Amino acid sequence: GWTPSSDIVNALEPVAPPTQKGIFAFGNSGSSVSMSNLMNSSGVIASDVTGVGSARSSLGATSYGGDKAIFAFGSTGSYTSISNLVSNSGVVASDTSGVGTVRVSSPATTFGTSGQAIFAYGYASSPTNISNKVSGAGVVANDSTGVGTARYDPAAASYGVGLGIFGFGNASGSGTAITNLVSSSGVISADVAGVGTGREAPAATSYGGDKAIFAYGTTPGVGTQSMSNKVSNTGVVASDTSGVGTVRYLLAAAGYGGDKGAFAYGRDGGPRYSIKNLISNTGVVASNTTGVGTARSNLAAAGYSISA
């Protein structure tokens, strides 16, 4: 029978293979560090790899180019916009001079089908909503005018086909649950009313091939959290799912095995952790797995490699 043209377009739209491995890097173990920890396609995190690039914390990371990753922004003791590219074999490159407003707590997600990505939000001299796109070759662009509520310490992940979402964060001193969707051309939408408990410094990753999940974080005046919120393949955020694992914030998350994810590291007030919680391809958060690598917080993570 006849196939509608929209279905033809959808069927022919190139879809990048999902990443199989992840990398957790940089952070704060009491002071800023630059080591990295690679995660294999089974979700096993390896021991520390000696750091390359300026030690820093409160940075962001995302995949780019289909099978590589980039870490950018953060604090070396002062705010910076330097970036470090990661090859498809997980090798971290030396610093690339910064582009865009220096800031901290600015997460990132992929968008489109050409390996692009976008960093957004964060804290400069105050909460901000500026964004910086990343080309499929890993080149960071200048600032784009902000959209949505200025805030820092949200989290971000990809969902659907070529789409992304920023959610939660600290706006004006309080935790929020608002989200902002990212189109396949990298356009950030206006605020979407929050669903779930408002909080800052959660982490997020994709799972199930086309969905995402936010988990953990802290709510000012309430305390550290472990609940999660799933995101459908149309970008709809679900209400809270009861928490699993140790409550913590300032952790990181990355996908592995093509359709699963892992949340790892973080802190709860004083203690810093290296524990890990795996996410199944149906979005179920597993109980704690004993940590590997230096316990730390304020790190970032991203997927890389399309080879298992």
Question: What would you call each of these model-derived segments?
Answer:
Residues 1-308:
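Polar, enzyme-active/binding microenvironments
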